[in-house]
Amino acid sequence: DGRYWVMSGQRDYLESRYGLTTEVLVKYPEPHLMAWHEVPGKTPYPYQEKAKAGLLARLHARVEMGTGLGKSFILLNIARELGLRTVIMAPSTSIADQLYQDFVKHLGRKYVGAYYDGKKDFKKLIVIGNAQSLTRIEEGSPAWETMSKAQVFMADESHLCPASTLNRVCSGLLADAPYRFFFSATQMRNDGLDKLLDAITGPTVYSMTVKEGVDQGYLSKPVFRVIKTRSDKNFESDDANEMTREHLYYNTLVLHQAAEVINQSVERLGHQVLVLIDEVEQFTRLRPLLNHKTGFAHGPLTATTFHENGKIKAKGNRESVPKEYWESEPNKLVDQFNAGEFPILIGTSCISTGTDIRTVKTMVYLKGGKSEIEVKQGVGRCTRKVPGKTACSVVDFDVANIAILSKHAKARREIFDDIYGPVQVVDWGS
């Protein structure tokens, strides 16, 4: 009939850029307000109400809000107000699990199911899954037949999902879901597929940066300090990851300087201290330098395996970790840390994104790299505002005599400055 069909998220772009007239043929079912199972102990902030109103007015749209501004609370309220069959996708198991616990608490186990990490409770009104599990659902399977009938699709931290993964879920399993809402701290991409993401998510109807959240009194202010240090190792490699490992992760001087920051923050300032690391071995080397009780949040550890002749077949990471730390329940450890049961929490990527860490007043960032997404997600672990907390110190390290690491540190400083500058630089022996 001479008309073109496009992804519905492209509607605003086509109308504003080319002056085209579009027609929306999507049918939206009537909402059915759900009763609270347990009423939340807080009411939405005005900006959360604005974000929710913008999404519900547009029906297919996204919001961009800095980490710590309560995107998951908006998600919960939208799911309750619509009361329709809903699938919520998180980018990781840790984020999915946090959402699941919140939804079960406030809407009831009767209505909330989980589809991730081996859980396959997909027949509930609201199902929360992670991207990995949802993309593996085969067409025609019982899970597909049930979940493909969802009327609402919501994606939390949508920028952390590859655009191709998001497209597979939105155009496959959830192709018939009319209501579509996307939540993220930023929609920036590392994969160059920004236009595809825009077509999937639709227009941004509300945005608030971390700086805006701090200035308006909703977030704790991150105070950034970068310590210039050095490496005395002679190791050289064309592999930036290997250089980071040798000159930052396993740098004895950096580890001792980090330990000094951690111990002094606890002893002199009375701070709860969060340490973000990339590899288990960093914990193994840092822990003996710390003077206080420490929690360690990590994923499954692997044991070293051997050939019949006794030679190592595959080296694991469990043997280097004290046995008392072999088992880890990240969400439980975060709760204990928030409750003040121990003053130091060291964590790998399992807690660096989408984890509700509240009481941290000093964060030590030992992950290196230059990913804007990873750095901003890490900083987001310390911006939650709670009684008695208005600011959080963020400490990073610049191994100044190693060119590639100093280049990465410069990139992180620029990210810090963009979040909430200025950044203080302190020379501790470069």
Label for each model-derived stretch:
Residues 208-273:
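Conserved interdomain linker/interface between the two RecA-like ATPase lobes of SF2 helicase motors
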Residues 381-413:
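Conserved segment of the helicase C-terminal RecA-like domain
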Residues 85-95, 246-289, 416:
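Conserved strand-helix element at the start of the C-terminal RecA-like helicase core
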Residues 58-79, 346:
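Walker A/P-loop
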Residues 97, 111-122, 141, 274-276, ...:
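Conserved helicase ATPase core of P-loop NTP-dependent helicases/translocases
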Residues 152, 159-223, 416:
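Post-DEXD/H (motif II) to motif III coupling segment of the RecA-like Helicase ATP-binding lobe
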Residues 187, 362, 370-394:
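Conserved SF2 helicase motif VI
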Residues 72-105, 189, 279-281:
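Conserved Walker A/P-loop ATP-binding site and its immediately adjacent core
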